[in-house]
């Protein structure tokens, strides 16, 4: 059920109350395991309220969409205006009323590039918190991608396809990623989103008779490096996200007056290449007003339709794809699934982590690390973590930090073999690890930095700026990583099995190896003091 305005919402609730009978209806609301996802985007404020059950089924109860000028403000003046801030808070306050009406158990509110790139970002987020009570997380592009991939994965099976190209057009950027049987093989982003493109080149529109041609030239210039990577690859599927694709699909479907065939994506559809090209030729010659009146769309949609079509047209030319697959999903759906995984411990959570790790191995391969050594250190580090849970009492999130740091601890060798630890820190901090926030990257980079002889110190600025809890997390995980690294100093993977036993203040590492491990034992003892200092037990072989 879609709520077009807030008054309709209360009419609907009253009618439902009368239809079911008061007690029955109130019981249904009370029993509903409701969650909510709020997306504060560049063009729209969106909220989805859903009901989840133990069968991993999410049923949308309410979708609310309100237009906003956040992106227009940010991409033109780099600041969000006071007027836009007031409008945003007004609508979000109404969102919170719906959250109370549905007795939502858990919610997640996020903002994307419109707020993320605004110079007054912190002021806006604080005003939202004070005026509405909503705690909004300003996510980065990789987190945004993680939620979208999660949403797609619940509605399809990308793992079964050999090679998939995913093109995600947001208001601020275009992100291109390649997946091979579910593993990320390539990712790159270009800041030519539909709204940013329109705002960046807007002043040229009155100076040329062929503004679409100017935009196309600009797009091709920005996508040059991406083109060289993907133009010779054969994709089983081109998946399109965002960029008013649903509007484009509806226009084409209405024009053909028949439903397109269903594809492998549940509730998904596709646009045939020839149909898209025909629409491209028509819209390319139209003004925003002509688009609005011809296709019955709002002005906001009309002004984004042309740049979106031009961007997708560029990718169709590059890939020779026969169609564009359109998962009928959204960023909000991905957030809802993420909330559901946390609440119900859904099996797909492990699958989501696999996407993160595949993106990490993509980075590792790019920096030409020793994959066997990295995989061995990862295995040993996670084994130590799992067998010492009673000592450190850390959770799955921290385990993921350790896993990523273990894989990437040597990436700095690519830049400087002599000072590779600090270079590993610098490289990791500047990576796009899918699903990782800026804070996640900072913690992981610190853990990787201290994998060798160096230990965390207050004089290290990047360690000093962490809060006390995060400092402790870094120290514990780097202490574990040090020992894992020490046990493969030869890079020969000599240790076949590792079992830990404890006796008072001693932690025994029982190693099974068929080779001489004198070097490993020596290096282990050199790195054991820091482990004892942090965790209070002395590791012994």
Q: Which residues does each PLM region occupy?
A:
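Helical "lid/coupling" subdomains associated with nucleotide-phosphate turnover
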Residues: 33-35, 49-51, 73-98, 112-120, ...
């Amino acid at each position: 059920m879609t709520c077009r305005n807030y008054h309709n919402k209360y009419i609907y609730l009253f009618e439902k109350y009368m239809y079911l009978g008061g007690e029955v209806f109130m019981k249904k609301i009370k029993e509903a395991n409701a969650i909510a996802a709020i997306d504060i985007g560049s063009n729209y404020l969106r909220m989805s309220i859903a009901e989840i059950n133990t069968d991993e089924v999410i049923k949308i109860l309410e979708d609310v969409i309100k237009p906003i000028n956040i992106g227009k403000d940010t991409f033109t003046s780099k600041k969000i205006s006071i007027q836009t801030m007031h409008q945003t808070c007004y609508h979000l306050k109404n969102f919170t009323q719906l959250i109370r009406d549905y007795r939502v158990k858990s919610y997640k509110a996020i903002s994307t590039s419109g707020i993320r790139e605004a110079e007054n970002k912190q002021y806006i987020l604080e005003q939202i918190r004070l005026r509405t009570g909503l705690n909004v997380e300003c996510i980065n592009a990789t987190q945004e991608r993680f939620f979208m991939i999660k949403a797609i994965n619940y509605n399809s099976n990308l793992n079964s396809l050999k090679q998939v190209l995913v093109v995600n057009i947001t208001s601020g950027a275009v992100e291109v990623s390649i997946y091979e049987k579910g593993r990320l093989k390539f990712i790159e982003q270009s800041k030519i989103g539909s709204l940013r493109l329109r705002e960046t080149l807007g002043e040229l529109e009155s100076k040329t008779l062929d503004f679409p041609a100017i935009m196309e030239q600009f797009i091709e210039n920005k996508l040059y490096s991406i083109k060289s990577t993907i133009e010779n690859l054969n994709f089983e599927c081109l998946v399109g996200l965002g960029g008013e694709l649903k509007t484009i699909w509806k226009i084409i479907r209405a024009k053909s007056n028949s439903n397109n065939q269903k594809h492998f994506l549940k509730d998904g559809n596709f646009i045939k290449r020839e149909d898209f090209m025909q629409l491209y030729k028509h819209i390319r010659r139209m003004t925003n007003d002509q688009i609005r009146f011809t296709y019955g769309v709002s002005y906001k949609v009309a002004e984004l339709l042309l740049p979106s079509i031009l961007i997708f047209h560029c990718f169709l030319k590059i890939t020779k794809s026969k169609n564009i697959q359109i998962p009928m999903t959204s960023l909000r759906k991905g957030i809802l699934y993420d909330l559901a995984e946390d609440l119900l411990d859904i099996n797909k959570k492990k699958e989501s982590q696999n996407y993160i790790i595949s993106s990490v191995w993509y980075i590792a391969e790019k920096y030409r690390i020793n994959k066997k050594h990295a995989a061995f250190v990862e295995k040993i580090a996670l084994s130590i973590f799992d067998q010492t849970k009673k000592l450190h009492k850390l959770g799955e999130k921290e385990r993921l930090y350790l896993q990523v740091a273990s894989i990437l601890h040597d990436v700095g060798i690519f830049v400087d073999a002599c000072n590779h630890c600090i270079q590993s820190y610098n490289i990791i901090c500047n990576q796009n690890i899918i699903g990782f926030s800026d804070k996640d990257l900072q913690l992981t980079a610190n853990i990787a930095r201290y994998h060798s002889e160096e230990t965390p110190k207050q004089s290290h600025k990047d360690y000093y700026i962490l809060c006390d809890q995060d400092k402790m997390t870094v120290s514990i995980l780097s202490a574990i990583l040090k020992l894992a690294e020490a046990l493969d100093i030869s890079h020969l993977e000599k240790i076949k099995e590792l079992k830990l036993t404890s006796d008072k203040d001693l932690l025994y590492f029982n190693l099974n190896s068929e080779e001489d491990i004198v070097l490993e034992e020596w290096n282990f003892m050199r790195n054991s003091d820091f482990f004892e200092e942090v965790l209070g037990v002395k590791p012994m072989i």
